[in-house]
Swiss-Prot record:
Pathway: Carbohydrate biosynthesis; gluconeogenesis; Carbohydrate degradation; glycolysis; D-glyceraldehyde 3-phosphate and glycerone phosphate from D-glucose: step 2/4. The active site is at E346, H377, K506. One of its GO terms (biological process) is glucose 6-phosphate metabolic process. Its main location: cytoplasm. It comes from Agrobacterium fabrum (strain C58 / ATCC 33970). It is found in: Cytoplasm. Its EC number is 5.3.1.9. SUPFAM superfamilies: SIS domain (SSF53697). This is Glucose-6-phosphate isomerase. Catalyzes the reversible isomerization of glucose-6-phosphate to fructose-6-phosphate.
């Protein structure tokens, strides 16, 4: 594998491979050769710094890295999350073919289908009004209380599928900052509000602190007996949930082979199901399952997750680009970059290989972004003219949901395509000067101004085009990126499915709480922490 990486570096260092403007000028078939389609989903990677030799080497790298074999281990239920001795089977949650999936020789599909059916029954009852609040009023607002994977996925997907909302209003509370829950409660009528507490262990400090506040809100307004009518839980800690006051028919479980950042397909998706209905939630699962089958069956050169992962690895470990920008040209995908940030950085932000040795080269990049066109008026300046090359990934639907605003959608499309073209083509010094002089500027002044209007170009980007952001399309897009992260993780030779980096800060916060409360001395902590504790204590009311 290392020899192939060295070949890639040697090939990429040649001008022919990385001069995108010249590559397009020399080959009018470049788009057709370096784009691939799955149903209506098109992936154009022709604006990446690749040629035929590089793509062939990347295909070879995938085989040498064992991506296909590891893929089968994941789908078949092997415990590839070896640091926690767990299978990785978010794919089973959307296994619409219902073929058996074995974990420890037990088919998990009956349990998966059972939870999905229970979710559907509960969601239908809330949506129809047959399941009411304590005072007999219909539920109008659903508040999901969770954090991390129990929040980012439902928030992102619920916003993305806003045109399909025909259920109660959805709200999401995650931050332990009391402002988050306080601002949400101000919007609610306790008689018509349902709270979903999403915590596998029912011990997550942020979630349980907010849950306690929500419980007081209901109990103080409606009485202790009302709690059971206004709460549901997504958890496996049945005893703790019962102690909270939530009845068993309002508890929806999931399994240790479902990682938090991969859990939107599970009962964690309950608020989404209530918002869009069980039928549309089923289509959401259908889209993900379609991508699962494509990932598992398509040849590497026609396989969107494979190609996306290979190019991501190439950008990170061959071209040494430390970051990638996620740029959906869809306002309803405004939380998609944050969702992918967790998916990618929590999965592949590792420094140790599966052998316990330091990673050679680099692991996952910094992932960030904002929807277009907003980002154009914020950070695109740096992407176009900054000293760092930042690979960009654009997403655009051919059709919106507002036919009366078709012209605005056409403007959106034009902006998206223009940005990817500008990143690739750039503008030479001669072109910049010619543009200035054509507007009447004197040569001497144009010579002075033109360098500031030069765009180097050769800034790589990938563009995804699809028909419309339906539940099916969103499920397919999320699954595409999940599998991309998997491919890169295999090539980085890391475990993409644990997250030990989250733990140390949690442990230290537990020890610092009594210090912040003034119950213990800060002695024993470093001088900076001691100084910060003292400064905050001095300002506290």
């Amino acid at each position: 594998m290392q020899a192939t990486i060295e070949k890639l570096k040697a090939t990429a260092s040649s001008t022919a491979a990385t001069d995108l403007r010249a590559a397009f000028a020399a080959d009018d078939q470049r788009f057709s050769r370096f784009s691939v389609k799955f149903d209506d989903l098109l992936m154009d990677y022709s604006k990446c710094a690749v040629n035929e030799e590089i793509v062939t080497l990347l295909e070879q790298l995938a085989r040498e890295g064992g991506v296909e074999a590891k893929r089968e281990e994941m789908f078949s239920g092997k415990a590839i999350n070896f640091t926690e001795d767990r299978a990785v089977l978010h794919t089973a949650l959307r296994n619409r073919s219902n073929t058996p999936v074995l974990v420890d020789d037990k088919d998990v599909m009956p349990d998966v289908n059972g939870v999905l059916a229970a979710m559907g029954k509960f969601a239908d009852a809330i949506r129809s009004g047959s399941l009411k609040g304590a005072t007999g009023k219909k539920i109008t607002d659903v508040v999901n209380i969770g954090i991390g994977g129990s929040d980012l996925g439902p928030v992102m997907a619920t916003l993305a599928l806003a045109p399909f909302h025909d259920g109660p209003r959805a709200h999401f509370v995650s931050n332990i900052d009391g402002a988050h829950i306080a601002d949400t409660l101000k919007l609610l009528d306790p008689e018509t509000s349902l709270f979903i507490i999403a915590s596998k262990t029912f011990t997550t400090i942020e979630t349980m602190t907010n849950a306690a506040t929500a419980r007081r809100f209901i109990a103080e307004k409606l009485g202790e007996g009302a709690v059971k009518h206004h709460f549901a839980a997504v958890s496996t800690a049945l005893d703790k949930v019962a102690a909270f006051g939530i009845e068993s028919d309002r508890i929806f479980g999931f399994w240790d082979w479902v990682g938090g950042r991969y859990s939107i397909w599970s009962a964690i998706g309950l608020p989404l199901m209530i918002a869009i209905g069980p039928d549309n939630f089923g289509k959401f699962l259908d889209g993900a399952h379609a991508m699962d089958r494509h990932f598992r069956e398509a040849p590497i050169r026609e396989n969107l997750p494979m190609l996306l992962g290979l190019i991501g690895f190439y950008n990170r470990n061959v071209l040494d680009y430390p970051t990638r920008a996620i740029l959906p040209y869809d306002q309803r995908l405004s939380r998609f970059p944050a969702y992918l940030q967790q998916l990618d950085m929590e999965s592949n932000g590792k420094g140790v290989t599966i052998d316990g040795t330091p990673v050679e080269g680099q692991s996952g990049p910094v992932v960030w972004g904002e929807p277009g066109t907003n980002g154009q008026h914020a950070f695109y300046q740096l992407i176009h003219q900054g000293t760092s090359v930042i690979p960009a990934e654009f997403m655009i639907a051919a059709n919106g949901f507002e036919p009366e605003l078709r012209h605005q959608h056409q403007l959106l499309i034009a902006n998206c395509l223009a940005q990817s073209e500008a990143l690739m083509k750039g503008r030479t010094l001669a072109e910049a000067k010619a543009q200035l002089t054509s507007k009447g500027m004197e040569d001497s002044q144009a010579d002075f101004i033109a360098p500031h209007r030069v765009f180097t170009g050769n800034r790589p980007s990938i563009t995804f085009v699809y028909d419309k952001l339906t539940p099916f399309a969103l499920g397919r897009l999320i699954a595409l990126y999940e599998h991309r992260v998997f491919v890169e993780g295999v090539l980085f030779r890391i475990n993409s499915f644990d997250q030990w980096g989250v733990e140390l800060g949690k442990e230290l916060a537990t020890g610092l709480l009594p210090v912040v409360e003034g119950k213990e001395s800060a002695a024993g902590h470093d001088s900076s922490t001691q100084g910060l504790v003292k400064a905050l204590a001095g300002l506290a009311g």
